[in-house]
């Protein structure tokens, strides 16, 4: 088993290939469009909850080796931007920033309000980040992966920068991922 699979991102097969690679094991996936001179700024996108904690821990261990700083971002929906939700999200992000500091990664929290995909892409542009980190969606009850949703949309729009997809044990321990063709495919790129 591997912790991380790194591969060249391929726009023509982007989301479909990423799903196939994630189906092949319990690893995380780093999609890289081209050689990167350095990764100094990382945007870690999380939702409050246990899978988000896993995203922070894995990414923190990786990012400390890069010597990069991080921004920990959560996006609240417009109709969910209530004081209680904002306070809960703020506490979650503050705990994540403390965790990253313990790992030697300087970090800052950020909360945006709006459509998740649009707000993440806007933050990527404004912050000029070198790496985007997204949590792999939890497997749906029918066993299918959900990269065709928000994560898939972001993968399609962020093709110019590396994207790390972090898998939580909460998604790994559920039903296996099935591809868009309805079966588990084991791509040759992963099986050696």
Segments the model singles out, each with a brief description of its role:
Residues 24, 37, 41-110, 129, ...:
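Small/aliphatic-rich secondary-structure junction motif
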Residues 112-119:
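Charged docking surfaces used in two-component/phosphorelay signaling
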């Amino acid at each position: 088993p591997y912790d991380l699979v790194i591969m060249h991102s391929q726009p023509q097969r982007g989301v479909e290939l990423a799903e196939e690679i994630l189906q092949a094991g319990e690893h995380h996936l780093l999609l890289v469009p081209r050689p990167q001179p350095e990764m100094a700024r990382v945007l870690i996108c999380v939702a409050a909850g246990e899978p988000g904690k896993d995203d922070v821990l894995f990414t923190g261990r990786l990012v400390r080796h890069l010597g990069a700083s991080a921004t920990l971002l959560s996006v609240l929906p417009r109709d969910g931007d209530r004081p209680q939700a904002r306070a809960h999200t703020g506490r979650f992000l503050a705990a994540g920033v403390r965790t990253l500091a313990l790992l030697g990664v300087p970090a800052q929290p950020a909360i945006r309000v709006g459509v998740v995909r649009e707000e993440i892409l806007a933050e990527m542009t404004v912050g000029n980040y070198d790496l985007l980190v997204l949590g792999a969606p939890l497997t749906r009850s029918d066993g299918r992966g959900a990269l065709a949703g928000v994560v898939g949309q972001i993968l399609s729009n962020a093709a110019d920068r590396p994207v790390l997809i972090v898998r939580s044990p909460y998604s790994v321990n559920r039903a296996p991922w099935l591809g868009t063709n309805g079966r588990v495919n084991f791509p040759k790129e992963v099986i050696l």
